[in-house]
Protein backbone atom coordinates (compact mmCIF):
# COMPACT_ATOMS: atom_id res chain seq x y z
CA UNK A 1 0.00 0.00 0.00
CA UNK A 2 1.49 3.39 -0.97
CA UNK A 3 1.49 6.56 1.14
CA UNK A 4 -1.44 8.12 -0.72
CA UNK A 5 -3.64 5.10 -0.10
CA UNK A 6 -2.61 4.94 3.57
CA UNK A 7 -3.42 8.63 3.97
CA UNK A 8 -6.82 8.19 2.33
CA UNK A 9 -7.65 5.33 4.69
CA UNK A 10 -6.53 7.26 7.76
CA UNK A 11 -8.57 10.33 6.77
CA UNK A 12 -11.66 8.23 6.11
CA UNK A 13 -11.34 6.40 9.43
CA UNK A 14 -10.96 9.67 11.34
CA UNK A 15 -13.91 11.14 9.44
CA UNK A 16 -16.11 8.29 10.59
CA UNK A 17 -14.79 8.01 14.16
CA UNK A 18 -14.73 11.75 14.90
CA UNK A 19 -17.53 12.92 12.61
CA UNK A 20 -15.11 15.34 10.99
CA UNK A 21 -16.23 18.40 9.09
CA UNK A 22 -15.49 18.40 5.37
CA UNK A 23 -12.74 21.03 5.72
CA UNK A 24 -10.80 19.12 8.39
CA UNK A 25 -11.26 15.80 6.60
CA UNK A 26 -9.95 17.26 3.33
CA UNK A 27 -6.92 18.79 5.07
CA UNK A 28 -5.97 15.51 6.79
CA UNK A 29 -6.52 13.75 3.46
CA UNK A 30 -4.24 16.14 1.60
CA UNK A 31 -1.24 16.84 3.87
CA UNK A 32 1.55 14.24 3.37
CA UNK A 33 2.39 13.36 6.99
CA UNK A 34 5.16 10.97 5.85
CA UNK A 35 7.20 13.95 4.62
CA UNK A 36 7.19 15.51 8.09
CA UNK A 37 8.39 12.51 10.12
CA UNK A 38 11.98 11.21 10.40
CA UNK A 39 13.01 8.67 7.74
CA UNK A 40 13.01 5.80 10.25
CA UNK A 41 9.31 6.40 11.01
CA UNK A 42 7.94 6.92 7.49
CA UNK A 43 6.24 3.52 7.42
CA UNK A 44 4.31 4.51 10.55
CA UNK A 45 3.34 7.96 9.30
CA UNK A 46 -0.30 7.01 8.75
CA UNK A 47 -0.75 5.08 11.96
CA UNK A 48 -2.88 7.15 14.32
CA UNK A 49 -0.21 7.65 16.96
CA UNK A 50 2.34 10.27 18.06
CA UNK A 51 5.88 9.74 16.74
CA UNK A 52 9.24 11.07 17.98
CA UNK A 53 10.80 13.83 15.88
CA UNK A 54 13.95 14.44 17.96
CA UNK A 55 14.92 16.81 20.78
CA UNK A 56 12.42 15.14 23.11
CA UNK A 57 9.51 16.27 20.92
CA UNK A 58 6.77 14.40 19.07
CA UNK A 59 4.43 14.83 16.13
CA UNK A 60 0.90 14.65 17.52
CA UNK A 61 -1.37 11.76 16.60
CA UNK A 62 -3.54 12.62 13.58
CA UNK A 63 -6.74 12.29 15.62
CA UNK A 64 -5.52 14.97 18.06
CA UNK A 65 -4.57 17.32 15.22
CA UNK A 66 -8.05 16.83 13.76
CA UNK A 67 -9.79 17.33 17.11
CA UNK A 68 -7.90 20.57 17.83
CA UNK A 69 -8.72 21.90 14.36
CA UNK A 70 -12.41 21.12 14.92
CA UNK A 71 -12.44 22.70 18.39
CA UNK A 72 -10.88 25.88 16.99
CA UNK A 73 -13.57 26.16 14.32
CA UNK A 74 -10.94 27.29 11.82
CA UNK A 75 -12.28 29.38 8.95
CA UNK A 76 -10.95 30.56 5.63
CA UNK A 77 -9.03 33.80 6.11
CA UNK A 78 -8.25 33.26 9.81
CA UNK A 79 -4.95 34.49 11.20
CA UNK A 80 -3.73 31.70 13.48
CA UNK A 81 -0.94 31.49 16.05
CA UNK A 82 0.57 28.05 16.60
CA UNK A 83 2.75 27.63 19.69
CA UNK A 84 5.11 24.72 19.07
CA UNK A 85 5.86 24.10 15.39
CA UNK A 86 7.51 20.74 15.95
CA UNK A 87 7.87 19.14 12.52
CA UNK A 88 5.35 21.48 10.86
CA UNK A 89 2.58 18.94 10.15
CA UNK A 90 -0.09 20.56 12.32
CA UNK A 91 0.71 23.96 10.78
CA UNK A 92 0.26 22.48 7.30
CA UNK A 93 -3.15 21.03 8.19
CA UNK A 94 -4.20 24.39 9.64
CA UNK A 95 -2.88 26.22 6.57
CA UNK A 96 -4.98 24.00 4.30
CA UNK A 97 -8.12 24.99 6.21
CA UNK A 98 -7.52 28.75 6.49
CA UNK A 99 -6.44 28.91 2.85
CA UNK A 100 -4.30 31.39 0.96
CA UNK A 101 -6.30 34.29 2.41
CA UNK A 102 -5.40 33.11 5.92
CA UNK A 103 -2.08 32.99 7.71
CA UNK A 104 -0.38 30.71 10.23
CA UNK A 105 2.32 32.16 12.48
CA UNK A 106 4.15 29.26 14.11
CA UNK A 107 6.63 29.69 16.97
CA UNK A 108 9.22 27.01 17.79
CA UNK A 109 11.59 27.05 20.76
CA UNK A 110 14.14 24.64 19.25
CA UNK A 111 16.00 26.21 16.28
CA UNK A 112 16.84 22.89 14.60
CA UNK A 113 13.18 21.84 14.52
CA UNK A 114 12.13 25.25 13.23
CA UNK A 115 14.67 25.09 10.41
CA UNK A 116 13.58 21.60 9.38
CA UNK A 117 9.86 22.48 9.50
CA UNK A 118 10.43 25.69 7.55
CA UNK A 119 12.21 23.79 4.77
CA UNK A 120 9.48 21.12 4.48
CA UNK A 121 6.65 23.66 4.49
CA UNK A 122 8.40 25.75 1.85
CA UNK A 123 9.03 22.71 -0.36
CA UNK A 124 5.33 21.82 -0.16
CA UNK A 125 4.27 25.35 -1.11
CA UNK A 126 2.79 26.51 2.20
CA UNK A 127 3.52 30.18 1.66
CA UNK A 128 0.85 31.13 4.21
CA UNK A 129 2.90 29.64 7.07
CA UNK A 130 5.66 31.62 8.78
CA UNK A 131 7.92 29.72 11.20
CA UNK A 132 9.69 31.81 13.83
CA UNK A 133 12.25 30.75 16.45
CA UNK A 134 11.29 32.06 19.86
CA UNK A 135 9.47 31.59 23.14
CA UNK A 136 5.97 30.68 22.05
CA UNK A 137 4.68 30.78 25.62
CA UNK A 138 4.83 34.58 25.23
CA UNK A 139 3.00 34.47 21.92
CA UNK A 140 4.11 36.74 19.09
CA UNK A 141 3.05 40.32 19.69
CA UNK A 142 4.26 41.57 16.30
CA UNK A 143 1.44 39.79 14.41
CA UNK A 144 -1.25 40.01 17.14
CA UNK A 145 -4.18 39.88 17.51
CA UNK A 146 -5.11 36.40 16.28
CA UNK A 147 -8.45 34.89 15.34
CA UNK A 148 -7.34 31.53 16.69
CA UNK A 149 -4.48 30.27 18.85
CA UNK A 150 -3.48 26.70 19.61
CA UNK A 151 -0.67 25.24 21.69
CA UNK A 152 0.93 21.86 20.96
CA UNK A 153 2.59 21.39 24.36
CA UNK A 154 1.15 21.39 27.87
CA UNK A 155 1.50 24.56 29.96
CA UNK A 156 1.35 24.88 33.77
CA UNK A 157 -1.47 27.39 33.23
CA UNK A 158 -2.85 29.42 30.33
CA UNK A 159 -0.16 32.00 29.49
CA UNK A 160 -1.46 35.54 30.00
CA UNK A 161 0.15 36.90 26.79
CA UNK A 162 -1.76 34.35 24.71
CA UNK A 163 -5.07 35.50 26.18
CA UNK A 164 -4.09 39.12 25.52
CA UNK A 165 -3.15 38.35 21.90
CA UNK A 166 -6.46 36.62 21.15
CA UNK A 167 -8.98 38.74 19.25
CA UNK A 168 -12.39 39.47 20.72
CA UNK A 169 -14.63 36.60 19.57
CA UNK A 170 -11.45 34.55 19.14
CA UNK A 171 -10.78 31.04 20.36
CA UNK A 172 -7.77 29.21 21.79
CA UNK A 173 -7.14 25.52 22.44
CA UNK A 174 -4.39 24.61 24.90
CA UNK A 175 -3.39 21.56 26.98
CA UNK A 176 -2.83 22.46 30.64
CA UNK A 177 -1.27 20.40 33.40
CA UNK A 178 1.72 18.27 34.35
CA UNK A 179 1.15 14.61 35.25
CA UNK A 180 -2.57 15.10 34.58
CA UNK A 181 -3.41 17.25 31.56
CA UNK A 182 -6.65 18.72 30.26
CA UNK A 183 -7.41 20.26 26.89
CA UNK A 184 -8.89 23.69 27.56
CA UNK A 185 -10.97 25.72 25.12
CA UNK A 186 -10.68 29.47 25.74
CA UNK A 187 -13.17 31.91 24.22
CA UNK A 188 -12.99 35.69 24.42
CA UNK A 189 -16.17 37.73 23.94
CA UNK A 190 -16.48 41.18 22.36
CA UNK A 191 -15.89 42.85 25.73
CA UNK A 192 -12.70 40.88 26.34
CA UNK A 193 -14.23 38.56 28.93
CA UNK A 194 -12.80 35.05 28.88
CA UNK A 195 -14.67 31.78 29.21
CA UNK A 196 -12.93 28.42 29.64
CA UNK A 197 -14.22 24.94 28.92
CA UNK A 198 -12.55 21.61 29.68
CA UNK A 199 -12.71 19.27 26.67
CA UNK A 200 -11.12 16.28 28.39
CA UNK A 201 -7.93 14.45 29.30
CA UNK A 202 -4.93 14.55 26.93
CA UNK A 203 -1.20 13.87 26.91
CA UNK A 204 1.34 16.31 25.44
CA UNK A 205 5.03 17.09 25.89
CA UNK A 206 5.67 19.99 28.32
CA UNK A 207 5.75 23.58 27.08
CA UNK A 208 9.05 25.35 27.51
CA UNK A 209 9.56 29.07 28.00
CA UNK A 210 8.79 31.90 30.39
CA UNK A 211 5.20 30.70 30.88
CA UNK A 212 6.06 27.03 30.46
CA UNK A 213 7.70 24.43 32.68
CA UNK A 214 11.15 25.51 33.85
CA UNK A 215 12.83 22.11 34.25
CA UNK A 216 12.45 20.64 30.76
CA UNK A 217 15.39 18.73 29.33
CA UNK A 218 15.86 17.96 25.64
CA UNK A 219 18.06 15.02 24.70
From Swiss-Prot:
It is an enzyme of class 2 (transferase). One of its GO terms (molecular function) is protein-L-isoaspartate (D-aspartate) O-methyltransferase activity. It is found in: Cytoplasm. The keyword Protein biosynthesis does not apply. Transmembrane segments: none annotated. InterPro entries: PCMT, SAM-dependent_MTases_sf. Its EC number is 2.1.1.77. The active site is at 60. It catalyses: [protein]-L-isoaspartate + S-adenosyl-L-methionine = [protein]-L-isoaspartate alpha-methyl ester + S-adenosyl-L-homocysteine. One of its GO terms (cellular component) is cytoplasm. One of its GO terms (biological process) is methylation. Pfam families: PCMT (PF01135). It comes from the Archaea. The keyword Methyltransferase applies. NCBIfam families: pimt, PRK00312.1, PRK13942.1. This is Protein-L-isoaspartate O-methyltransferase 2.
